[in-house]
């Protein structure tokens, strides 16, 4: 039987774990192979329906308990619960702006971890590079300050086989965070988005809830000075 693995914070899936990576056939070309990060754990459900008590043990905290364990589950205070953000990017110049926005507009950026699958060719913008100058010349940029909380799996764009496989690689990088979410590579976040989204999740009173949305057009949607949303309606996809 498998239990909930011990965890730490901050954590990485691409930098210090490369000796644990596994090689698998490329899903689009059997004669080729790809090397991928391993999953965080073997199936802790052991092919049985997990009890609520078991499920609520999963989830890291930015501060350990008195025994030094970061895997505190629902005993972790709301503002210390970690958030995993997976991004699949295909040659998207806006990706680094998205990553910057994630950290810059979070109320508690120290609890965010971003895992990017960056499908690029030589000369493309890189998802974890700062927007303006280098980290050496401008170390206060968000990507520089929180670089240890960003993991990037780089793939040659010609090897891409659509968004599903890229997202699979992204989610292989999950490492026990309390909340997990998926974002496009061209998203602008609103101020205190982390607190807002957790409040929405917890307000449902349902442990099985999944929040999803079709994102609103960025034009006239966010106050550039405050970072707050200027829209208070649901997105409308069709007009009649």
List each model region and its residues:
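Catalytic cores of eukaryotic secretory-pathway lumenal/extracellular enzymes that build
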Residues: 2-240
């Amino acid at each position: 039987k498998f239990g909930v693995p011990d965890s730490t914070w901050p954590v990485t899936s691409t930098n210090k774990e490369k000796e644990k990576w596994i090689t698998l056939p490329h899903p689009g070309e059997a004669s080729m192979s790809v090397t991928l990060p391993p999953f965080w754990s073997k199936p802790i459900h052991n092919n049985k329906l997990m009890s609520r008590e078991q499920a609520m043990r999963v989830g890291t905290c930015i501060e350990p308990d008195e025994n030094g364990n970061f895997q505190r589950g629902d005993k972790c205070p709301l503002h210390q619960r970690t958030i995993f953000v997976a991004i699949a990017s295909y040659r998207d110049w806006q990706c680094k702006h998205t990553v910057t926005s994630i950290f810059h507009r979070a109320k508690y950026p120290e609890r965010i971890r971003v895992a990017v699958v960056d499908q690029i060719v030589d000369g493309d913008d890189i998802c974890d590079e700062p927007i303006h100058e280098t980290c050496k010349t401008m170390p206060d940029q968000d990507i520089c300050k929180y670089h240890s909380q960003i993991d990037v799996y780089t793939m040659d764009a010609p090897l891409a086989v659509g968004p599903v496989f890229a997202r699979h690689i992204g989610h292989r990088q999950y490492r026990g965070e309390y909340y997990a979410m998926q974002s496009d590579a061209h998203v602008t976040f609103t101020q205190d988005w982390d607190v807002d989204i957790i409040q929405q999740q917890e307000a449902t009173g349902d442990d099985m809830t999944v929040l999803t949305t079709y994102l609103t057009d960025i034009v006239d949607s966010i106050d550039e000075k405050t970072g707050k949303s200027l829209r208070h309606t649901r997105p409308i996809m069709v007009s009649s």
